[in-house]
Every structure is written in structure tokens, then in C-alpha cells.
Amino acid sequence: MEYKNTLLMPKTEFPMRGNLPKREPAMQEKWAEMNIYEKVQEHTKGRPLFVLHDGPPYANGDIHMGHALNKVLKDFIVRFKSMTGYCAPYVPGWDTHGLPIEQALTNKGVKRKEMTVAEFRKLCAEYAYEQVERQREQFKRLGVRADWDNPYITLEPAYEAQQIKVFGDMAKKGYIYKGQKPVYWSPTSESALAEAEIEYQDKKSASIYVAFPVKDGKNVLEGDEKYIIWTTTPWTLPANLGISVHPELEYAIVKVNDEKYIIASELFETVAKTLEWENAEVVKTVKGSELEYTVAKHPFYDRDSLVMLGEHVTTDAGTGCVHTAPGHGEDDFVVGKKYGLEVLCPVDDKGVLTNEAPGFEGLFYDKANKPITEKLEEVGALLKLTFITHSYPHDWRTKKPIIFRATAQWFASIEAFRKELLEAVAETKWVPAWGETRLHNMVRDRGDWCISRQRAWGVPIPVFYAENGDPIITDETINHVADLFREHGSNVWFEREAKDLLPEGFTHTGSPNGEFRKETDIMDVWFDSGSSHQAVLEEREDLQRPADLYLEGSDQYRGWFNSSLSTAVAVTGKAPYKGVLSHGFVLDGEGRKMSKSIGNIVVPKKIMDQLGGDILRLWVSSVDYQSDVRISDDILKQVAEVYRKIRNTFRFLLGNLDDFNPSENTVAVAELREVDRYMLVKLNDLITKVKDAYETYDFAAVYHAIHNFCTIDLSSFYLDFAKDILYIEGADHADRRAIQTVLYDVLVALTKLVTPILPHTADEVWPYVPGAEEESVQLTNMPEATEVEGSEALRAKWDAFMTLRDDVLKALEVARNEKVIGKSLNASITLYPTAEMKAMLESISEDLKQLFIVSEYKLGGTIEEAPTEAPKYEHTAVVVAQATGETCERCWVVSETIGKDAEHETLCERCATVVKENYVK
């Protein structure tokens, strides 16, 4: 007889190798055929809603690692919620207006100046839809389950119509106004920018100290002094109309040789060192408030520079006397307005100085720095010129420096509802908790929101102007424009004359001749995406406002979190979200930002083509995503190793359940042995820990718990112990069925627990699970813990055993290294445990050979009675010797019972019995 044929070895068709790059697309086709999204929604219908609202990625180019991290995190949450009692719809979105699409077309050779705005916008829309399609397929490849056939896209007519309504509601409440104010201006884009559209990069700038002679000292100064200002933007000096000082600061009149200078007293030493003053002497001090209304002379123009008081003046740098140009700075503008200064801005849309800057007209602002500095030197006003590298705002699209420039723009008044915004921030749950402080401070400190842009591709600002110049925004015009957009799309604004966009028969007192013109500016794209709570959450029947969660990168505190909050609070008085979760950025393995120049860009598509989507998803679950995260080939190799461990665990479980029918072979919990019940307790611990971790969005805890369970609890302990019984005993042996009962519970629970993270693998496992009836594991619920009587005592006892087992394994390893034994099954061990361990060992003595995987086990006295040569460990002394007897051909155990059964001379007594009872007819 071939005894190897009597062993019940694992048997399954579940493949050992994942081959995910090939298998996953096939699984996704299967999901598409069965309409998995609709199936899950149908299955969870009627449950409480959980809405995670998708922040729309920008529709331009392939998805990058930041996109992958974001979408996969969202997918974890949505999948978990749909398996824990919620209906969790997920509607993906795309942000489709804005400058990058205009630039992409220009780069492709589109001659926009040779076509109408409407024609150019049609090309923009076509391009945007192509990009949506491209990204949609890439997101689907990640295994993200979503309503891919019905996304929201910001260029769609229904969306634009709702955005117009949001604008109209804000205007109705008096929150929208037109005014001339300094705004972030990008000369390269020729447009205003919002705070969310700027990024800071290092820039080299001139750093100059300039003297402004006093013209009128107002009886506080003698008139022969000079104010010293410091600036890194010499090009703004032609626009200087004043000098700001702090009312509470003390200012010093400093005599240096024959000159007298005015600076803040506490900056005396710093300025003296910078300007290399020798023998400088403070001859007088005055309070800043006393200097108000003194007058200085502009260094190279024949005009006054008024000295004003400003709370914005600090002593962090400079001189305490601040160059003030109301057309080129927010603080300057506010102070200048208070003192009645004009808003002088001698720079045009392209960043070129105009004839209001005599002597420098026609120069690009940055190129004007040198001639202006030379002019200052010529007139004796330049005290110091150096160059510094400092953090400076840049256009996030063109990556070029931006300027502050006063222009006529449309604004949303944040001041009008700032209190409500701050209350909404306080009522929201923030993860991480510092998010609340971050957004609170942004809302507290931000100025009014400049919402107009001087571009073509976007949603028009729905304002008309009467003949007398009055802007017209009424319920009637807003509703009419919204209806037109819903029917024809926003291109209609550029295809029709103003009169054809107004309601029929519309009249206005400011237009006696019935003539009107329309606004040509478009809305900031942050107003587009920031209106999604109205256009998507409120409008779609399967969603609700407020959403339960917004989840985006940490850059969105100043972006989508902020713009959505602003429009929602303005329109509804409440935040559009109950909770906000943010994640960090994806860096390379060395913690560097990814960039083409370094050549360290990791592309999701490449990972999926080489390793598979589930490996990428497992990586997402492994990182502390609330901070910046790292990815590299080495990191992915480690993750792939963990994946292999999990997959092999599934394969082992399936292989050993091939002959198990849960409805017929399950053993009642009360009838299981202690070790089996202990394993159920460990499984319960895993279920609780993993579900709690999912609930708190701690996916790294899920990853580590599952990995540790597979490697430590299963592979290194229970499965190792179980093999002897599973393979050697007869199919229906009570101990074997007991172990299979536990393995079955583990298999079902583990498959469900990994489903949110590894959906492809979980759905690959599911059809092999005995008794699985559902078409997909996604249509099941998360596992519940099994009631195990006396679980606390059981856990305490067996956790203690596991520490003792570690001692025994160490002793066996030493014996192996010293060539006392070959493998552990060659060993005979005698234990001399501590007193408390002894009683525990006696209570489970019949299982100990299998638990230690040795051929012979003896219990000696206590640790104090152990032979002196016996190695002592924390809980026991261990004597390891070669087991006596011969090796059984079937089970490999060394036994003195080999050959006792004459019919089976090479088998031990146990194997001979099993063979006779199960295989001999």
C-alpha cells in the first residue's frame, strides 16, 4: 500500500500564485457583468445612509500616486460601511474647468485667437471628457467600486445650473460684491488667483533699504530726518504713496555722521549691523502714534508719502517703517483706504509697468527692479542692496511668481458670515484633530474671496450691466440663466447677446434704451467644486447633505474643504460635511517629493501592471496616511511579501476544508478542545480589533492585525499544530472536524475582513469557500465574534502557554544547532516548568506532543528540580534528547510502536489504526 495516498493532504484549485496583473482585469469584467455597484446598492437599500462625498480630481492627464492613495482610502471606507449596516453610495466626480485645460489645448497647437470663445470652449469640453474617460478607467483598475456610469462632472449643464443658483443665493444675501482690491495676480495666466491656487517656492529677490526724506515733521520731527524702509519688491516703489508705522512701537531718531534716520528702536542693532553704521547714536525716541500724518518725500517722484498707523507693522524683519503701496498689498490697501489714499497700480495684466510709472513704462515688473534700484542709487536714496532667497508665492499652474495687484474683481464677502463659518468648523469632526485648528485659523484670517477670473474656460459670472453701469443680479435673472444653462450648457452665455440671455421683456431703470451688456469674467474653479454640496449631494436622490465625510489631501484645507464650507455656510448656514479626514502626500523611498527632474516618479499604472491593484491597495493600508507617506520598489517588495503570506494562508485554509461541509461537519463550540476554542478567542480578538480599526479609519492597524494573525497565530502556531491531525487522522475524526470547524470560521471571517482592502483577492477566494451562497463577498456583512464561554480565562491560560512554548522552541533551536536533533519531530523533550505553569501543562498534557511538534513529551519536576545542565528559560527548563524508536513512514513521528501491527510494519500504532479503519476494506 502507498501510505502517502492515505494522507489527507490539502487540496484546492485556488492558485498559489496571485498573477494579479492578469486576474484582476478578469475579476473587474465579472463585476461589470454582474453590475456589482448596483447589486450592493440594492442589497443595502433601506439601511441608514453613509455618504462619503468625492472631492473631484482635476481632469487632466494620468492619475498619479496621490490620486491612487486618495481613491483607495475612500474605497476602504465605503466598502466597510456597506458591510456594516449602512447603505454607502459612492458617486465619483471630476473638476473640469480652468487654466490647465486651456493650456493643454494651446500646447497641442490650438490657435485660440483664430476662433470664437464659444468654439474654443467646445474644444475644452471635448478635451475634458477625454481626460475623464482616461482617468475613469485607471480608477476602475484600482478596484474602486463606484457609480462609474453616473459620475458628477462640473462642466455638465445640470451641475452648472446649480452652481449659478449657489451664486444667486449668495448674491441675494449680499455676500457677492464687485470692488477694486489687490488680489493675487498671475502675469503668466493673465488672471486673478485665489489663495488655493498659489504655492510657495524659493525665489531670489533684491533686498533694499531706502531713505525717504521727511518733508513735514508736524512739530514732532525737525524735518532733516529720513525714514528708512526695507523691501524685496523694488518694482512696487513707483506705486508708493505712504509709510506705515505701528502705533505702539517706539521709534528712534538715529544720528549717523551727518544724517538722521528713523527706525523702530528694537531694530536698532539689526539695522545698524546690516547698514554697517559706525558711531550711530540714538538722539531721540518717539512713539509710533506721534508720527501719524508726518509727511515724507517719494525718493524719485515729486509727490508725498504719508506716514500712517498700521497694526500690520511688525519687528520680525526690516526697519519698522513699512513701504505702503495700496495698489500692491492687502494691508497697504486697508491702511490706504482708511487714510483716503488713491489705489495706484501702475502694472497691467501682463505684469508690465504702465505710464503711471514714469521712466519705467514698458518694463516687465521683474525686469524693472534693476533700473529702479539704479535710480535710487542715483538720487542717493539707496542705503543697501543685497540679494536674498525667500519663500515667495507662485502660480500653481504655471509655476511662475505672482504679484499683488489691484484690479476690479468680483468677491464673496467672507467677513459677512465669518462667525457662522467658525461655528461650522467647531461642529465638524476632524481627523486628524489638528485639521480643526488649521481650518479655523484659515477662516479666521482669510480676506474676502476673489471669485472672478479673466479666462475663457469656466462658468460665467451671471451678471448683467445696465446702461448706467449698474450690475444686475436678481432672482429673475439668476433663475433664467440657470434654466438656460440646464438646457444648453454655459456655452450659451458666449453664443448669445445679453438681451437674449435675459428673461423676455426684462426692463431695468438703469437701461432706459433697453441696452444691456454681460459680464465677461468666469468663476474661480474652486467655486465650481465648492458648489458640489448643492449640485450633487442635494440634487441626487441617493445622496444627502451634509455628507458624512469629505476625505482629501491636506492641501485641501485651503482648497475644497474651504471653498465647500464657504458656499455651504453662505447658502444653508451649515457645513456641507459632518466629518473631514485628510491624508498626506506620497514621497519617494527617501522621503523626497516626486519630480520629473529627479526621475523618482512612481506611477500607479506601472505598479498595477507589474504587481497588481491589490498590492497597491495593501500598500495604502500599510502606511500612516495621515502624514506624508513613502513608496519605492523596496517598500512594495515588502508589501508583496505580506500579500503572499495572506494569500498562502487562504490557500492553506481552503486546501484543508476541501472535504468539509459546514452544514454537516461543524462541531459545536462547547465540544471543541481548549486549543481550538482558544483559536476562536483569538479570531474574535481579530474581528473586534479590525472592525474597530476600520471604524476609526486606522487602516494600518487593520493591515498589521491581519498580517500578525496570519503569521503568528495561524502559521507559526495553530496551523503548524493542526497539520498533524488534519493530514494523519481519518476524515471524520472528531479532532480533525473540530480543527476544520475553526479553520472554516477563520476562513469566512478573514475573507470578509480583507474585502475592503483586497477586494479582487477576497472575491477570488469566495467561490471556493464551502457553503458560500452569495454571488460576491461584497454582498455579505462583516463577521461577528463567536460566543466562547469562559473566553477571558481561556485567553489568560493559553497566552501563558504561548510564552512557555516560545521557551521550548528556543531550546529545540539550540538542540538543532548543536546537532542533538535534526528536526523537531526527532526530539524527546522533558520540561521542568515553574510551579504555576506545571498545573497548566498537566491540564492539556494529551495535546502537548502536537503543540510542541515533538515525538515524545515528558513532564519532570519544577524548574528548581531541573538537572543543572538543562538550559533554563523564563518559564521552564528544557531537556532535549533524541526520541527513542523508529520513524513512522506515514506521520514521521519517532515511536517505539513501529511494527507492532504486523500488517503495517513501518507504521506507528496510531497510523496503523487510522489506515485499517479508513483505507483497508
Swiss-Prot record:
**Entry's PROSITE patterns?**
AA_TRNA_LIGASE_I
Write down the EC number: 6.1.1.5
Annotated Zn(2+) binding sites: 888, 891, 908, 911
- What is the superkingdom listed in this entry's lineage? Bacteria
Where in or outside the cell is it found?
Cytoplasm
> Which GO cellular component terms are attached?
cytosol
- Any single Pfam family the record assigns to this protein: zf-FPG_IleRS
Which pairs of Cys residues are joined through disulfide bonds in the record? none
Q: Which GO terms describe its molecular function?
A: aminoacyl-tRNA deacylase activity; ATP binding; isoleucine-tRNA ligase activity; tRNA binding; zinc ion binding
Q: Which SUPFAM superfamilies match?
A: Anticodon-binding domain of a subclass of class I aminoacyl-tRNA synthetases (SSF47323), Nucleotidylyl transferase (SSF52374), ValRS/IleRS/LeuRS editing domain (SSF50677)
UniProt keywords (A-Z) are:
Aminoacyl-tRNA synthetase, ATP-binding, Cytoplasm, Ligase, Metal-binding, Nucleotide-binding, Protein biosynthesis, Zinc
Which annotated residues bind ATP? 596
Note describing how the cofactor binds: Binds 1 zinc ion per subunit.
Motif 'HIGH' region covers 57-67
Cofactor(s), by name: Zn(2+)
What InterPro entries does the entry give?
aa-tRNA-synth_I_CS, aa-tRNA-synth_Ia, Anticodon_Ile_BEm, Ile-tRNA-ligase, Ile-tRNA-ligase_type1, Ile-tRNA_ligase, M/V/L/I-tRNA-synth_anticd-bd, Rossmann-like_a/b/a_fold
Its function, per the record, reads:
Catalyzes the attachment of isoleucine to tRNA(Ile). As IleRS can inadvertently accommodate and process structurally similar amino acids such as valine, to avoid such errors it has two additional distinct tRNA(Ile)-dependent editing activities. One activity is designated as 'pretransfer' editing and involves the hydrolysis of activated Val-AMP. The other activity is designated 'posttransfer' editing and involves deacylation of mischarged Val-tRNA(Ile).
Q: Which family does it belong to?
A: Belongs to the class-I aminoacyl-tRNA synthetase family. IleS type 1 subfamily.
Subunit organization: Monomer.
Instruction: Kindly provide the name given to this protein in its UniProt entry.
Output: Isoleucine--tRNA ligase
* Gene from which this protein is expressed: ileS
